[in-house]
Design a protein with these regions (language model features):
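Transmembrane helical core of 7TM receptor-like proteins
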Residues: 1-308
Length: 308
């Protein structure tokens, strides 16, 4: 099979034969997806409605919650539709679109955490200049960069994938994966390999490095401040540190599953680990921030009470 026109769809082989369990899996996934949409939407509305939350940190959180909805929408509808498919086929355009969208969402997540880490750095290390540095224009610029940087990076990376000719169509996963798609190509140029490495560097290594630098600067200040200020710093920084750690673990699972031989791991465990990021993060993020940050916790309680 040397002609790329013969490959019109990819087969998601990780589903296997789930039999009657498809109804249980579908119900659980639908419930989880609706829960993710509800929780994140409520927090978005709370931040939008409550003027007390119109501060840099909460505006940046607004982007994070919106991205959780986008990432979940990129995954769950397709996965749920595949539950009732006998062939588990996905057309090339849809597969490319899902991969592109998922990679954008992962990058937006990291960029949002970078912006929030910078916000915490200014608030803790330069408190007297916080209102000057984190003004409305600066927050607006950060919000635009959070979305534009991933979009431009992904366009650049996928411009090398779309023209590829494919000699295989079986993807051993429950969703479309960028690296596994490239592996199915009849031939991969050095440019494709370099673009993949550059994409990983620009969307993962650089953001993680910036987050690490921010918290390395925050830590000495927290250690040399009063107990009250230290407690405030811990309260606002803990959800971000947990989010970054969870994201890091999820990315390790994702890339390990795509790039290494994991034959010793059972299929169910492997599927769960590859989905860890897209299952836990969309719900974990709103729970952590909605519960740990006092202002948001008070606001959504007032919001729910007023509705009732």
């Amino acid at each position: 099979m040397e002609n790329s026109t013969e490959v019109v769809s990819f087969v998601l082989a990780a589903y296997g034969h789930i039999g009657e369990l498809k109804y249980l899996y579908f119900s659980l996934m639908l419930l989880w997806y609706l829960s993710v949409l509800t929780v994140n939407t409520v927090l978005i509305i709370v931040i939008y409605v409550d003027k007390k939350l119109h501060e840099p940190m909460y505006i940046l959180l607004y982007n994070l919650f919106a991205n959780q909805i986008g990432a979940s929408t990129a995954l769950y509808p397709l996965v749920m539709s595949q539950m009732f498919s006998d062939t588990h086929e996905v057309t090339l355009p849809w597969c490319f679109l899902q991969t592109y969208y998922l990679y954008i969402c992962a990058s937006v997540e990291l960029c949002s955490l970078v912006a929030m880490a910078y916000d915490r750095y200014v608030a803790i290390c330069c408190p007297l200049y916080y209102n000057v540095i984190m003004n409305t224009r600066q927050v607006g610029t950060l919000s635009v960069l959070v979305w534009m940087y991933p979009f431009i990076n992904s366009v650049f990376s996928f411009s090398f994938v779309v023209p590829l000719k494919f000699c295989g169509n079986v993807i051993d996963k429950v969703f479309c994966d960028h690296y596994l798609i490239i592996k199915l190509a009849c031939s991969v140029s050095v440019l494709n390999q370099v673009s993949d490495l550059l994409y990983a560097f620009s969307t993962i290594v650089i953001p993680f490095s910036l987050i690490l630098i921010s918290y390395m600067k925050i830590l000495p200040v927290c250690l040399n401040t009063s107990e009250e200020n230290r407690q405030k710093a811990v309260t606002t920084c803990t959800p971000q540190i947990v989010s970054v750690s969870s994201l890091f673990i999820g990315l390790i699972f994702h890339f390990s599953d795509s790039r290494f031989d994991v034959a010793l791991v059972s299929d169910k465990v492997r599927i769960f680990l590859s989905l860890f990021l897209l299952i836990c993060q969309p719900m974990g993020t709103p729970i952590m921030y909605g519960y740990k940050l006092p202002k948001i916790r008070q606001s959504w309680k007032r919001f729910l009470f007023d509705i009732k």
